[in-house]
Amino acid sequence: MALNYISAAEAASLIKHGYNIGLSGFTPAGTAKAVTAELAKIAEAEHAKGNPFQIGIFTGASTGDSCDGILSRAKAIRYRAPYTTNSDFRKAVNNGEIAYNDIHLSQMAQEVRYGFMGKVNIAIIEACEVTPDGKIYLSAAGGIAPTVCRLADQIIVELNAAHSKNAMGLHDVYEPLDPPYRREIPIYKPSDRIGQPYIQVDPKKIVGIVETNWPDEARSFADADPLTDKIGQNVADFLAADMKRGIIPSTFLPLQSGVGNIANAVLGALGRDKTIPAFEMYTEVIQNSVIGLIRDGRVKFGSACSLTVTNDCLQGIYDDMDFFRDKLVLRPSEISNSPEVVRRLGVISINTAIEADLYGNVNSTHIGGTKMMNGIGGSGDFTRNAYISIFTCPSVAKEGKISAIVPMVSHHDHTEHDVNIIITEQGVADLRGKSPKERAQAIIENCVHPDYKNILWDYLKLTDGKSQTPQAARAALAMHAELAKSGNMQNVDWAQYK
């Protein structure tokens, strides 16, 4: 079947008000860019005429500004799921302008298949190659592309020359059956391949191919500083000690690491610690730091959903694909984040918290309990199922006016039942095998900033102690209330709650 090449504007014109569109990508890697940019123009033109124009968006995770950002500014998004990092989208969500469904990334594809979110009208898929018989070779991310391609009535392909055809073969495309026919996902080590390197679709569904040359809108992160370096070193020291004790096998276990400066500092510290052997990663996102560790021989293999790297780094991977081909694989997000596989492989998860409380509950999504930051992402997929689950964060923020450790988190994402270890620059709180009272003691002694230790000890004195989990109901969120009132949690006055 002959391929039909159209412009981005022509492709965008196929999308109507009220449609749900499914996008490839996971982070800004591998997501639609050209068609969504044109779609924003259509929305603005329709709004100028007094006509409604909004759509629903289903993605693997966040996208770039040419999708989430430009469509938010055009007020073109009615509904979106899941995770995002765009500031304009965040503002619209917190203003109540967009219905945002913040679900676990591993569940996104299956919930779309189950019909929980409605019909997929059109899929927009970024590819490095597409063939007349319907083989779509994805670019730098897996996401939910296999599912939305299968369910969508029509498919638009953004054939992006910014992604080398050397990316062909990087992906392992596998979509599980739905209940009651689902079988085990047969991954027994991070390097296992169980699918095919492309998405096979009915070529009649491909209504247009848009040729682009649009690099991924990758973010770069600030260099490590003494604080993030200390957190990273604390993580590395803890894992090395656990290995020495025999809790972690001497061959080590696969790692999952989140995104950002702290994650990079953790990986850097692990790479430098030669008591930890070269290790594998079974994670959702591969950043520049992982690529450096692969080149240095410190990471033996990386399995992920996306290459969320700078464009120079990505081009280096494409140029050196002979080296990387047996060291990297990209999977759909329901496989990269599969709780089943995470538990089978014994993955050690390392994620970042916004705040944690005295008993090990973690908030990783909301500021002050009500304002969305980014979303839960894949942290829940890994945390509950990890061999060891670790959360990291600085002990304080805003020049010490905010403590990351509070009596009770203002929003619960990860419960005390799932969190094993909390690490700040102050130290490591090992919560494994401990009662709530023992966890509180470990967290205050090891993770809390000195400015807040006495404050939190004094909070515990408000409780009568005759409980499994000591909380003073009236005072549990007093530090948050004080922050809203005076701008500084240190000003909390427990005498008001006696």
Please report, for each region that a protein language model flagged, where it lies by residue.
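Conserved alpha/beta enzyme-core scaffold
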Residues: 1-498
